[in-house]
Structure formats: C-alpha cells, structure tokens
Amino acid sequence: MTFSVDKVRADFPVLSREVNGLPLAYLDSAASAQKPSQVIDAEAEFYRHGYAAVHRGIHTLSAQATEKMENVRKRASLFINARSAEELVFVRGTTEGINLVANSWGNSNVRAGDNIIISQMEHHANIVPWQMLCARVGAELRVIPLNPDGTLQLETLHTLFDEKTRLLAITHVSNVLGTENPLAGMITLAHQHGAKVLVDGAQAVMHHPVDVQALDCDFYVFSGHKLYGPTGIGILYVKEALLQEMPPWEGGGSMIATVSLSEGTTWTKAPWRFEAGTPNTGGIIGLGAALEYVSVLGLNNIAEYELNLMHYALSQLESVPNLTLYGPQNRLGVIAFNLGKHHAYDVGSFLDNYGIAVRTGHHCAMPLMAYYNVPAMCRASLAMYNTHEEVDRLVTGLQRIHRLLG
C-alpha cells in the first residue's frame, strides 16, 4: 500500500491536541511512541468483553484469552522472522529482557576471568545488568570505543575478543546518536570466538524490518511501547536450543511443571518457564495490534518515508546558528543536539512553550555524555507520523531561541 502520513496521523488521537495553545509536534517517540486507535481499541475491547486469566482455565473466556495471547507470540515471531514462536518470551520491556538473560544465561555461563563486550554508546539497560553480572562472578566488562562522528571504532574489536569472551551485548541502533551498527560482521566475529550475541533492538524494530535468522544473533530484545504498542510489554527472542538450556530467573505460578514440599519443583518448558505469574495479557493484546498496524503499513514503506524526513531535517537544521549535532549523517530515528552553551533543559523548555515535545537529559546514556563532555543533550526523534511541517517548526523554534538567548 502507498504510505500516507495524513492517514497515519488520523489514527493517533493525541496528535490532534494542542499544547500551550499550539498544535502538538510530538518529537519524542524514541522515548515512547504514541498509540493508534487500533491499539487502544484492541486492548479496551479485550478488557470490556474478553478478559480472563490465561492458561489452565477450562472456561471459554480463559481459553479464548489464552489463544489470543499465544497468537500474538506467533505474530511477533513472524515480525522478526524467528524460526518458532517458542523462541519468544513475553517480558515487561527491553530492560527486563536483558536482565533475564544476564541472570539466567549469564549466571550459568559467565565465570571469573571471563569477559563481556559492550559499546560506549549503550543505553544503561545494556550496561548495568552486565556490570552487575561481572561484579557477581568476577568477570571483566570490555568496551568498544566511539569515534567522534558517533560510529564505533570497529578496528578495536579484534583486540577486545579473546578465548574468554562469553558475550557481545550491542545496540542495533543508538538511542542518542541514531547510529545503526553493522551487526552482521560483529556477530560473525563474536561467533568465531565462541561468544554469544545479544542485540538491543529497542530503537530498530519500528524503523525497518528485522530478521533474527539473517542476523544470526543469539538474543534479540525490544519493547512494545516504542513500537506504537502499550507500555509494560516486550519481546525477548532466544535461539531455541539456547533457551531450552537456560534456567528460570523468577519463580511462581505458570512456570512450573510440579511443586512438592518434599521433592522440590520442576519447571515447565521454555518459553513459559520464564513467564512466572499472571502476564500482562491486555498489553500483549495491544502489542499484537501494534504489530499488525505497522505490518499493514509496511515497514519498508515506513523506512522510506522516515529516511526522506530525516534527510530533510538534517538539511534544514544546518540553518540554525551555533547548533551542535551529535551522531553520523546516516542515522535512524533520532537527532541529538545542543544549542550554543545553553543547557538542554532550557532549550527543551522553550520548545515546549512552542508546542514541540523533545527529550532532554542524559537519555540513560551517561557514558556517552561523558565522551562528548556534556551534561545533557536535546533529542528530537522522528517517527512515521511526523511531518515536514513539524520539522520546520522545530527549526524555527531553535532559530527563535538563538535570537532570544544569543
């Protein structure tokens, strides 16, 4: 189908509202994307007419809710081209997915003297769990350094990998710089050294198709709320053989086969042994609607539109005096910047007065801020519902702030 941004915008109720007396220009989708009516309605319909606890229930509502939940698992597996739906675990989001891997696979496979490799551009969610794991077991955390243009110093990889490397944990797309990392070569190199690879896909899956089989990564994780779905739900993909070997992380209902006070507990098979307790079934239903929504639009169509919009934005921002942009020319989704010597919070507050929503702060990437020697950045993110006119408003707003503040 032909991509129409006007038709897309009509599906998002919040985009019709005003902020400070001006039409909302929502440029903060990298933090959390807005939700189309199709997602809102699907979740509301489930709670109105179809809600029940899933699994084990013999009554109709429970059986139907279970079927709907498992159908979303199947849809998500097709979305990332997994071999099987049973390679996907429902998690609260990217952060929980990474922590699950660190506490299940990591505790079982990383030992004192081993090392894990991350990069200098990672979100805290792909730093802190590995720091905690390394501290627990006495392993080393190694870091791929950055180039000033926001790309990684890939030439250092050969010196970082050795026979003690157990994992490469790498972002697919930087949440600050928009850098898309060249995963294919990195994954091949990691596997040549016997290491597993976890990919943080939180900032990638909404921008273009992702094929986990083609990537050949061992773990891939993403959140629903950045993909126009609900909060509190995400997907962890793990290669099936690897997933079946992993011990459970959390204990409780739904993840057991048998429980005995005298003989202990046995686990059900994966992925269900990683889904203890009552799941966020409504969120799962909403995620399914979000996956269907972007799939119908076509991720290739979305990618083409967003690429054109990004090129336009970068071109227009060249007209803003004293504007510092961070990241490479070829980027996905986000534009991080500072205006002169003004603090990002001040710039963001002025933009909010103009009805423009951007993110300000360290963006859960403090090591990246330290590399650029700044306390914070502004970040405008471009999604499939953003327009050239909204880019123009951002540029005009920054020009106005420059005139006001100098």
UniProtKB/Swiss-Prot annotation:
The keyword Lyase applies. Its cofactor is pyridoxal 5'-phosphate. GO terms for cellular component: cytoplasm. Coiled coil: none annotated. It catalyses: (sulfur carrier)-H + L-cysteine = (sulfur carrier)-SH + L-alanine; L-selenocysteine + AH2 = hydrogenselenide + L-alanine + A + H(+). Signal peptide: none annotated. One of its GO terms (biological process) is cysteine metabolic process. Pathway: Cofactor biosynthesis; iron-sulfur cluster biosynthesis. The modification N6-(pyridoxal phosphate)lysine is found at K226. CDD domains: SufS_like (cd06453). Homodimer. Interacts with SufE and the SufBCD complex composed of SufB, SufC and SufD. The interaction with SufE is required to mediate the direct transfer of the sulfur atom from the S-sulfanylcysteine. This is Cysteine desulfurase.
